[in-house]
Design a protein with these regions (language model features):
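Small-residue-biased structural context
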Residues: 2-198
Length: 198
């Protein structure tokens, strides 16, 4: 069986399709307002890092420091989502704040489960409203099963994976869990998503 890479790319929510926006890496010295003006979907990313609007002309670095967010981690996520970073070097990976990244992923999970999935279901219901009832039922059931799988997966990450990573950060290794177990579970949700798309 082919081993999949469990990297930042596989852990972040779906990349933004923002090819029409500014190209080039964002840096700590760039203004946060420029980031938002040039890539307005980054407002969602900011909120997942716990950064609120109202920063005026401050730089990305200043805003991150004022909000207790590791600027390198914030910029890595931003530059990945804007398509400027395709993968991570060991140097960049080692400089990431895993605690900041976990907090971001936790907030992304909350957003996805509380807002995104219900909104997708509502739009799906609108789209299939003219379908024969038996077809609409099958589509709705498949979506609901998928949503339940996503919910289980994210709950698993919250209750098992994130505490495991935090324990590792605190020097506590586990003999009952490792990242290979996570990888296997993650592949299952990837397959379910692929089934839904097809």
């Amino acid at each position: 069986m082919e081993q999949k890479d469990v990297s930042l790319e596989t852990q972040l929510p779906i990349r933004l399709d923002i090819a029409m926006y500014k190209k080039g890496l964002y840096r700590e010295t760039d203004k946060m307002s420029d980031l938002i003006c040039e890539n307005y979907p980054m407002v969602l990313v900011m909120s997942r890092f716990g950064i609120a609007l109202g920063f005026g002309e401050k730089s990305i670095g200043e805003v991150c420091r004022q909000n207790g967010v590791d600027a390198n981690t914030f910029l890595t996520v931003v530059n990945f989502l804007t398509g400027e970073v395709q993968g991570l070097t060991d140097e960049v990976s080692n400089a990431l704040s895993l605690e900041t990244l976990i907090r971001y992923l936790h907030n992304a999970h909350d957003y996805f489960l509380a807002f995104r999935l219900p909104n997708m279901r509502r739009k799906l219901n609108e789209a299939i409203s003219t379908c024969p009832e038996d077809v609409a039922f099958v589509i709705r059931r498949f979506f609901d099963e998928y949503a339940e799988e996503v919910n289980k997966h994210m709950t698993y990450e919250e209750k098992v994976v994130f505490p495991y990573v935090r324990d590792l950060l605190n020097g506590k290794a586990s003999d009952k869990y490792n990242i290979s177990i996570f990888r296997k579970r993650h592949e299952q949700i990837d397959q379910k998503l692929s089934d839904l798309k097809n």
